[in-house]
């Protein structure tokens, strides 16, 4: 499972990094976090968390600095968080999280992306009840049992710890993600491959042939939208 999360980050960086989309999206997220609090990660935990994730995605320093400098200025640009839910082929389900300065534009774009790529957008709650929100932490290691004990001793609400292919994956209650990261740091973990709040499907479906091709095109269309921050789904192997 650790390899799965690391591969997701690597594939996203490889796909989006070529045209700087991932950098632009992180720029918006960093700006919003810095604007809502202090533009200093030491006194702004939300900003610190975003910067940690930006580092994992290899976002260049100049992009980060530009977003923080923008937040320090007098700009009044406002971004709104949103969530959209929908369906793809053969039982596939999708959740899309957005950060946008124009909600009407975003809703129209996503509806078009679903409609043109074999899917359809559903009502709020039509999909999310089949997913669970969890903190996901991945780092190099192989001893799941000792990590589990370490987190329990730190009073972290840890749901599961898995070790596979040289990586440890920790699942926490969403409210304990940040505390879990700090507990692991205190225990000697210096670098993290993944630190994310994720929507984990309660069950997965397997797609093949044309269904898989259609689904991949749908995911690409959604992720290519500038206002989309995250896309979650229940398809195995992707």
From Swiss-Prot:
It is found in: Cytoplasm. The keyword Lipid metabolism does not apply. GO terms for cellular component: cytosol. Gene3D superfamilies: 1.10.10.200, 3.30.70.980. Keywords: Cytoplasm, DNA-binding, Transcription, Transcription regulation. One of its GO terms (biological process) is regulation of DNA-templated transcription. The keyword Translocase does not apply. GO terms for molecular function: DNA binding. Coiled coil: none annotated. Belongs to the TACO1 family. YeeN subfamily. This is Probable transcriptional regulatory protein SMU_1789c. It comes from Streptococcus mutans serotype c (strain ATCC 700610 / UA159).
């Amino acid at each position: 499972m650790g390899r799965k999360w690391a591969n997701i980050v690597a594939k996203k960086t490889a796909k989006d990094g070529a045209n700087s989309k991932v950098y632009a999206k992180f720029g918006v997220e960093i700006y919003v976090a810095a604007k809502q609090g202090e533009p200093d990660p030491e006194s702004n935990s939300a900003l610190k968390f975003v910067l940690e994730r930006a580092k994992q995605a290899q976002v260049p320093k100049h992009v980060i600095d530009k977003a923080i400098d923008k937040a320090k200025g007098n700009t009044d640009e406002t971004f709104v968080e949103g969530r959209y839910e929908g369906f793809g082929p053969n039982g596939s389900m999708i959740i899309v999280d957005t950060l946008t300065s124009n909600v009407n534009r975003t809703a129209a774009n996503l509806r078009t992306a679903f409609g043109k790529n074999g899917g359809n957008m559903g009502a709020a709650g039509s999909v999310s009840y089949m997913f669970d929100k969890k903190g996901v932490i991945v780092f190099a290691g192989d001893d799941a049992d000792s990590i589990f004990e370490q987190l329990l001793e730190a009073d972290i609400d840890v749901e599961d710890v898995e070790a596979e292919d040289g990586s440890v994956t920790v699942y926490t209650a969403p409210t304990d993600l940040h505390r879990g990261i700090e507990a692991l740091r205190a225990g000697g973990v210096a670098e993290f491959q993944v630190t994310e709040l994720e929507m984990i499907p309660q069950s997965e479906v397997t797609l093949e042939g044309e269904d898989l091709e259609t689904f991949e095109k749908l995911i690409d269309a959604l992720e290519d939208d500038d206002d989309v921050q995250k896309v979650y789904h229940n398809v195995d192997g992707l």
